[in-house]
Amino acid sequence: MTGNEYQELSKRTIATPMDKKEEMLNHGVFGLTAEAGEVSSLLQKVYQGRPIDPVHMKKELGDVLWMVAEICTAMGFELDEIMQLNVDKLKARFPNGFTVENDLNRAKGDI
């Protein structure tokens, strides 16, 4: 499945009307924050002596992805494009893989 296919399939469960892009954007951003908190909570439980439940983690990461797709839909972005832009940015920043030196010495304007 491509990112765009996922995005298209996920649209059927967006509760905000498609013509209410600002509301959709707000819902996606607030939802992303909440779902990231769910992922953090799973990791936090490790410090309480519990193992990470991989099935639960996969479900929460799916919720994170759904929120990212909703944000893309609200902004008129294609998820495949966002994925490619991110990979291109990381290739430029870390041409031979991650290094602390490259991370500390990013090009001007690298965000």
Where are these regions (language model features)?
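Flexible "arm" and connector segments at domain edges
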Residues: 1-111
